[in-house]
Amino acid sequence: KVKSLFPIFGVCLGHQAINNAFGGKLLRLSPPIHGKLSKVEHNQQGVFKNINDKEFEVTRYHSLAADPKFLPKELFITASSKDGVIMGLMHKKFKIYGVQFHPESVLSLNGYRIISSFLSECGYKILAESQFKFLEQKLVGHIKWVVKIPLNP
């Protein structure tokens, strides 16, 4: 029996642990996905509620994933990748969320919004839209600057 007094946000292995804690199973990806960008579609629920784009790119580093054939009845899918991997889960009753990707990664542009949505579930004030846009513009500018640096000078 689960009693969640505090909101929980699982990232990558934490996402998989949430799935398994409720009786789900994992599947092994072949090949593993490490440092790759993937498009994710979401339903604007849970930690995705502040993301206006129906589809966006995220950074993935994993070789295991929640098996959709064994999804626990207490959880529902909030996001999936184009290749059918569960990328977001949410508990039906408690404030328990998981994402398979890394919202903290520099290449996951909606990461600020995802983390902010979770923090709002914890009672913290989320950023204003103008602050999100400012952070995202700075991040995109930084990525463009880093990409211009030659790797083999």
Which positions does each model-derived feature cover?
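Cysteine-nucleophile active-site neighborhood
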Residues: 1-50, 115
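Hydrophobic/aromatic beta-strand patches that form the interior of the parallel beta-sheet core
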Residues: 9, 27, 59, 78, ...
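Histidine-centered divalent metal-coordination motifs
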Residues: 12, 62, 102
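Conserved hydrophobic/aromatic beta-strand scaffold that supports enzyme active sites
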Residues: 37-39, 86-88, 98
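Catalytic beta-strand/loop cores that center a nucleophilic Ser/Cys/Thr
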Residues: 46-94
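Phosphate-binding/catalytic loops
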Residues: 55, 100-109
